[in-house]
Amino acid sequence: MSVTLHTDVGDIKIEVFCERTPKTCENFLALCASNYYNGCIFHRNIKGFMVQTGDPTGTGRGGNSIWGKKFEDEYSEYLKHNVRGVVSMANNGPNTNGSQFFITYGKQPHLDMKYTVFGKVIDGLETLDELEKLPVNEKTYRPLNDVHIKDITIHANPFAQ
């Protein structure tokens, strides 16, 4: 199961882990299928750490799940922030997942069991390189020039009716 994020700087193909994180993947894939993420900017970009998106308001404070409320974390001892390109839900503490997610630029073991890992980049690491190079506001880590998710291709959706 995979999706491709088509961004202003290139494509990123992500494998999603539906068996280990079914609720998170159901939410993510439904948001992808409904074009929820289309036009979202990468609003937080910290070199060597991660890049974050998934907030339609572009502020880093917005975004909802498909259920209209925050939902619980899905941790697995098998899913770690152990390589470049891990995809996780962003949150504001335990069980506060909505629509925002981030992609790591490297190993981030301090995030394990605090953020739900639900995917990994399987193609497009060069696009991740381009994102990491973007100049940012040094206080807010927001890229100086907006980079958007233009649209998303779903390659196979096990939750589709």
UniProtKB/Swiss-Prot annotation:
GO terms for CC? Answer: catalytic step 2 spliceosome; nucleoplasm
Q: Which family does it belong to?
A: Belongs to the cyclophilin-type PPIase family. PPIL3 subfamily.
Q: Where does this protein have coiled-coil stretches?
A: none
Keyword match Coiled coil: no
Tell me the residues on which N-acetylserine occurs. Answer: S2
Q: Which tissues does the record link to its expression? A: Ubiquitous. Detected at low levels.
**Per the record's keyword annotation, is Isomerase included, yes or no?**
yes
Gene Ontology molecular function terms on file = peptidyl-prolyl cis-trans isomerase activity
What's the stated role of this polypeptide?
A: PPIases accelerate the folding of proteins. It catalyzes the cis-trans isomerization of proline imidic peptide bonds in oligopeptides. May be involved in pre-mRNA splicing.
Top-level EC class = isomerase
Q: Alphabetically, which GO biological process terms does the record hold?
A: mRNA splicing, via spliceosome; protein folding
Q: How does it assemble?
A: Identified in the spliceosome C complex.
Give the protein's recorded name: Peptidyl-prolyl cis-trans isomerase-like 3
Please give the residue positions where the record annotates the modification Omega-N-methylarginine: R61
**Gene3D superfamilies given for it?**
Cyclophilin-like
Query: Its Enzyme Commission number?
Result: 5.2.1.8
Organism of this sequence: Homo sapiens
Q: What is the lineage of its organism?
A: Eukaryota, Metazoa, Chordata, Craniata, Vertebrata
| Keywords, in A-Z order | Acetylation, Isomerase, Methylation, mRNA processing, mRNA splicing, Rotamase, Spliceosome
Q: Which reaction does it catalyse?
A: [protein]-peptidylproline (omega=180) = [protein]-peptidylproline (omega=0)
Domain (PPIase cyclophilin-type) spans 2-154
